[in-house]
Amino acid sequence: MIRLFEWLTQESLDLHYSLEESGIHGTSIVLNDDGFLPEGIISPYTFFCEVEMDGSPLYFNQLEVPYLWQITGTNIEGEIWNRSSKRGVIHYHEPKYLRFVQSVDWLYPDGSIYMTDHYNKYGWAFARTYFFSDQQVSHKKYYTKSGQEVLSENILTGDILLNWKGKVYHFTKKVDFFLFYFKKSGLDLSSIWYNSLGMPFLISYYLGGEGRDILFWQENLADQLPGNMQIIFSGRTSRTKKVIVQDRSVYKKLLHLVEEKNKEMISFLNIIYPKLRENYSRKEILIVTNSDQIEGIETLTDNLSAYTFHIGALTSMSDKLQNIGQKENVLLYPNMSPKTMLDLLEQCDIYLDINHGNEVLSIVRLAFERSLLILAYDNTVHSPIFHHESGIFNHSKPQTLSDWLLNLDDYSQTVSCWRSDLFPMTYRDYKQVLVSNVD
């Protein structure tokens, strides 16, 4: 079985994890390789360029630059200077604070980009993008470690040239290149599971023949089915016979949109998220914010005097937060490092999602995976998928949150119940729904 992803999005990683943890193994392929694919995930590029899984990421100041040029850097990005002229920008792979090079924009003296080098997790440049003077992309080329050009894509025309095993192959459409890859890969093509109606669907469609393909739908739906989904339900595909929806509300909407005869093709399976630890009902509260606008914080810190509040920020803190930090049960962590944040996630058993402004570093998901009790006000909810409705309180009555918490002794049981309500499907459900497609 093949799992086919167009991009390595968080949704793709979640599906990969859910299937692996359910014991449903297969080959995961990403069509667009950023050079930092996790172990066990491959791409057409790694196949044709015969990438050796050897080496380590390139640290930003190890980049080779012309003699007497200088490299400077922050935890956001690096820069390359020729005296007072900036000649390059170094972009880091996530997490940025590690400063591993993902790409380097090379600049003309006027600051425009003429070329971007793309680095992989083994520390060498595996691709290069070329730009016209108007900053439009012209070509992207892929190389072996020794620098031999293997693949060249004309972005404007869509033409692809592949130099492989002593022959040059010309493809006028990208889908034809991918079909060539699958036919040469030696992989079992009897079942392809994909999560996009873009290129992965086209590959399934044009590959033809008999197959047991599945579309995993991880997006929202409008009031009309997408065109390629209509093709699936009309029976015009020889391979895709099942659609798995991973959001319950979208699942219900899809059932409403399709004809009665097609409903049997549709099933629901939520994502299965990691559970990295248990909740120990400690009175340790975590808040992560880059804003001093924290809903109800005065009321909460006063009413929950027996609880310790750990308030962290990736930035410096305003006088307003510094004043809150004067309270005996409040500890502040300005300019907090990601490592400190992870340490606090292990130390705390309650996460208050009560900061206004943007969510910081997917903190709500990180808290959910570590079984923290997640509470919020109705005007501060971030990442609502991880919030149970029972843990969301009226912001005009901030004391209701603290009153509720004071009456709760066993956080672990509540967290377990909420998790089951939000994501009821288990590994057993995955096998039950999918087993006929992996036999």
UniProtKB/Swiss-Prot annotation:
Q: Which UniProt keywords apply?
A: Cell membrane, Membrane
Q: In which pathway does it act?
A: Protein modification; protein glycosylation
Record's keyword annotation contains Ligase: no
Q: Which GO terms of type biological process are on file?
A: protein O-linked glycosylation via serine; regulation of protein stability
Task: List S-S links within the chain.
Answer: none
Principal cellular location given in the protein's record: membrane
What does UniProt give as GO cellular component?
plasma membrane; protein N-acetylglucosaminyltransferase complex
Cellular compartments annotated? Cell membrane
Q: What happens when the gene is disrupted?
A: No glycosylation of serine-rich fimbrial adhesin Fap1. The unglycosylated version of Fap1 accumulates which is larger than the wild-type protein. In a deletion mutant, GtfA (Gtf1) is less stable in vivo, no longer associates with the cell membrane and has an increased protease susceptibility. Biofilm formation decreases. In a double gftA/gtfB (gtf1/gtf2) mutant, there is no further affect on glycosylation but biofilm formation is further decreased.
Record membrane topology: Peripheral membrane protein
Report the sequence similarity comment from the record. Belongs to the GtfB family.
Q: Which NCBIfam families match?
A: accessory Sec system glycosylation chaperone GtfB
Quaternary state and interactors:
Interacts with glycosyltransferase GtfA (Gtf2); probably forms a heterotetramer with 2 subunits each of GtfA and GtfB. Part of the accessory SecA2/SecY2 protein translocation apparatus.
Cited function:
Required for the polymorphic O-glycosylation of the serine-rich repeat protein Fap1. A stabilizing protein that is part of the accessory SecA2/SecY2 system specifically required to export Fap1, a serine-rich fimbrial adhesin encoded upstream in the same operon. The GtfA-GtfB (Gtf1-Gtf2 in this bacteria) complex adds GlcNAc from UDP-GlcNAc to Fap1, attaching the first sugar residue. Cannot use not UDP-Glc as substrate. Stabilizes the glycosylation activity of GtfA, causing it to partially localize to the cellular membrane where it is more protease resistant.
| Protein name per its UniProtKB record | UDP-N-acetylglucosamine--peptide N-acetylglucosaminyltransferase stabilizing protein GtfB
Q: Which organism is it from?
A: Streptococcus parasanguinis
